């Protein structure tokens, strides 16, 4: 081997030895810092280094957290939807999800994956960052980033500093607008309920077949309701002009089996709104109620079924706060503050539905004008409702027994659910309708014997 080759080899060995020594020293220093330096000091030094080097960087990073106080961060949700359309071949990891009743695959960015977007010739880099925090460290009751999750998620959007105004004034509004179209196009309806352990919303896919076409409801009531719903979603400017929160309230009342739940599903399908089914008996106090209500999304329906049984709806004049720390209750005033109080303006395009079997049991405070905008009586089955049921279940528009059946329906109280049950008893139309006649005749005899 020549002296020149030996010299190069010796130089390489020296360089490798130096690199190995530096690496070993770095590992040792890192171990010492982690083991012996307090976390506060470590964070302070790291923060100082980051601030020092940031002065020499042309880059700026916008941190977009999942929650902004009590509410979902609109920009975070928009970024999640928008970036699903920007995943390229260079992306290494993606998250794919499809529930049984979903028609489309949901594709989102996995944590620590970079997604590059170009807007007006400007390069913008997105990264999803997930930070795990112990539950015991959650101490901020005003921030859902800290109160509900053990994993805090945020997007980091990086760009050149000189494009800051463009990002804030043009790019992010563009992302929000595009995301709204994407979500509406691929939206799968969901129904949310409260997890009793964590006191947060959990959801499943809503695949309820009820529509206004199939609903056994008085035609005039149905027509008025559909017109009211369509008018509501088109009047954002109107609500802002008159100074009212963009919400609508409906009270559905009537005996069990008259289709209150089916009507709620029909409203959700008609408007493409998610449903939040709130069981007030599962909550301990007004603070939990407020936190849940503030975390509901826009374009949604809040449902409180059997409102007369859910909480002790006493008059607000006697609805005093209880200072006993063991006292657990959701009060009428706490609920009404969200329905039409100051908290009602936190959120847009929301529908509130209360149901009850006995309207007369409700506190007058719930029934006053302007609180529930429409009171919809879910009555016993009518001849018109029967014809809708016959069309849905038997696929017929007329039959020789219709006149007799309709006469019975006018004379007795029978719910649409009872009629529907009879219509499912056979595949033979004649046999089913004859069975319905016998059922109605027997029911009339029972009613007469009680008179």
UniProtKB/Swiss-Prot annotation:
UniProtKB keywords: ATP-binding, Hydrolase, Magnesium, Nucleotide-binding, Signal
Annotated positions binding ATP: 254-261
Induction of synthesis: Induced in roots by salt stress.
The keyword Nucleus belongs to this UniProt entry's keyword annotation: no
Signal peptide bounds: 1-25
Cofactor(s) this protein requires: Mg(2+)
E.C. numbers: 3.6.1.-
Matches recorded under PANTHER family: BCS1 AAA-TYPE ATPASE
Family: Belongs to the AAA ATPase family. BCS1 subfamily.
UniProt protein name: AAA-ATPase At3g50940
Gene Ontology biological process terms in this record: response to salt stress
Classification via InterPro entries: AAA+_ATPase, AAA_N_dom, ATPase_AAA_core, ATPase_AAA_CS, Mitochondrial_chaperone_BCS1, P-loop_NTPase
Disulfides per UniProt: none
């Amino acid at each position: 081997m020549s002296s020149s080759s030996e010299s190069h080899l010796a130089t390489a060995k020296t360089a490798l030895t130096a690199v190995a020594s530096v690496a070993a020293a770095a590992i040792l220093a890192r171990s010492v810092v982690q083991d012996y330096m307090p976390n506060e000091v470590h964070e302070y030094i790291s923060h100082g280094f980051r601030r020092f080097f940031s002065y020499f960087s042309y880059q700026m990073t916008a941190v977009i957290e999942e929650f902004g106080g009590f509410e979902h961060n609109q920009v975070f949700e928009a970024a999640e939807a928008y970036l699903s359309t920007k995943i390229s071949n260079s992306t290494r990891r993606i998250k794919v999800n499809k529930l049984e009743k979903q028609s489309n695959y949901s594709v989102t960015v996995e944590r620590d994956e970079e997604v590059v977007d170009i807007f007006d010739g400007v390069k913008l880099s997105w990264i999803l960052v997930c930070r795990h925090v112990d539950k015991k460290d959650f101490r901020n009751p005003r921030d859902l980033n800290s109160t509900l999750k053990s994993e805090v998620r945020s997007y980091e959007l990086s760009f050149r500093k000189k494009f800051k105004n463009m990002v804030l004034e043009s790019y992010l509004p563009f992302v929000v607008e595009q995301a709204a179209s994407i979500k509406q196009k691929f939206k799968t309806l969901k129904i949310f309920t409260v997890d009793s352990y964590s006191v947060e919303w959990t959801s499943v896919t809503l695949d309820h077949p009820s529509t206004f076409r199939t609903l056994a409801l008085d035609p005039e009531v149905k027509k008025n309701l559909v017109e009211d719903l369509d008018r509501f979603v088109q009047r954002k400017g109107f609500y802002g002009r008159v100074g009212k929160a963009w919400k609508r309230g409906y009270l559905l009342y009537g005996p069990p089996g008259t289709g209150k739940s089916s009507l709620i599903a029909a409203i959700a399908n008609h408007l493409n709104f998610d449903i939040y089914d709130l069981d007030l008996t599962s909550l301990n106090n007004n603070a939990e109620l407020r936190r849940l209500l503030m975390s509901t999304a826009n374009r949604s329906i809040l449902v409180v079924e059997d409102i007369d049984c859910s909480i002790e709806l006493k008059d607000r004049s006697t609805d005093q706060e209880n200072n006993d720390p063991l006292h657990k209750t959701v009060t009428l005033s706490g609920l009404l503050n969200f329905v039409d109080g100051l908290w009602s303006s936190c959120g847009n395009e929301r529908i509130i539905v209360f149901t009850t079997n006995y309207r007369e049991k409700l506190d007058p405070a719930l029934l006053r004008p302007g609180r529930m905008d429409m009171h919809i009586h879910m009555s016993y089955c009518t001849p018109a409702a029967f014809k809708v049921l016959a069309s849905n279940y038997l696929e017929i528009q007329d039959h020789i027994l219709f006149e007799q059946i309709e006469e019975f329906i006018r004379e007795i109280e029978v719910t649409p659910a009872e009629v529907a049950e009879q219509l499912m008893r056979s595949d033979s139309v004649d046999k089913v309708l004859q069975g319905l006649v016998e059922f109605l005749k027997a029911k009339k005899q029972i009613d007469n014997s009680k008179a």
